[in-house]
Amino acid sequence: MEPGRIVDTTAGPALCVKVCLVGAPQGGTMLNELYHSLDPVAFSAGPITIYWYGLAYMVGALLAGFVMYRTQKRWNIGFTPDDVMTVVIAVVFGLLIGGRLGYVLFYSNGYYFTHPLEIFFGTNGGGISGMSFHGGLAGGLLGGLFACRYLRLSPLTVADASFVGVPLALCLGRCANFVNGELWGKPTDLPWGVVFGGAAGNVPRHPSQLYEALLEGVVLFAILYVLSRRAKPLSQGSYLGIFVLGYGIVRFLIEFVRLPDAQLGYLAGGWLTMGQLLSLPLIALGAALLVYAWKTRRPQHRDWL
C-alpha cells in the first residue's frame, strides 16, 4: 500500500461497481465508465475489522506455501510440512519488514527520517500506511535465506519451489489495491476506464492494479506452473530467475500507465518513476539468475547449498 494515490476508502456503499453510460457529443460514441465504490472492509465483528488487504496477505501466503509444498513434492525434494511452514513464516516476516523499510527509503521522500517512530507505529494512531514490493521482495528473500540456514535446506531450491506460487499472492494483493482504490493509473478513454473519485478526480483511469494482477499474477503463475510440471525440473535458480525477470519487465511497462507517487512524481525525463528505477536491477538480476542456471545446470535438491 503506497500513500499518495489513495482515494476515499473509508466511505461508500457495500461491495459493488456501478456501470453507467455517459453521453458523448453528437456524432460520437457512448463510453462505458466503471465507477469505483468498493468497500475496503471485508467484514466487522464487534471491535474487530478485517480488511481485504489483510486477507490478501494471509490467503496469498497460504496459497504460496501450498503451491511450494506441492511443487517440491512433485520434484521429490523431501521438504516436510514443518519445513514449508517455517519458511513461509520467515518469508512473511521478512516481507512485512522489508516492504515497510523499502517504502520508507524509496517512497517517503525523507519524511520518516524526521518521524522515525511512525515507521512501525503509524501516525497519530491512524495505522501504518505504505509498503514497497521491491523492499518486500528483498526482505522476503532474506527471511527465506535465514530459514534455509536454520533448516539446512538448499536456498535456491526453496526459492524455486516458492516462487511458483508467489504470483498468486501478488494477484490477490493487486486485487486488494483495486478494492482499496489506490495505485490507480493515468486518465484513459478506453471502455474499461475506472472512475475512482476522491483524489483521483472524476475521470476514467487505467485500472493499473488489475493489469498487474493479470500479468504479474495470472500470466506469470501460468508460465511458472507449466514449467514446474516438467518431467525433469529446470536447474536451480531458473524459476526464481523467471519470476524476478518477468516481474521486473511487467512492472517497468505498467508504470507507463500508472501514476507515479504524488510525493515523488517523475524522477527524470517526465516519464521515469521510482517503480521503474527499482525494476531495472530486478531485470538484471533475473537475467543473471537464468544465465547462472543455464551454465551451472545444478539439479534441484534438498540439502543446504
Features from the language model and the residues they span:
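A feature for loop-to-transmembrane-helix boundaries and adjacent hydrophobic helices
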Residues: 18-20, 25-305
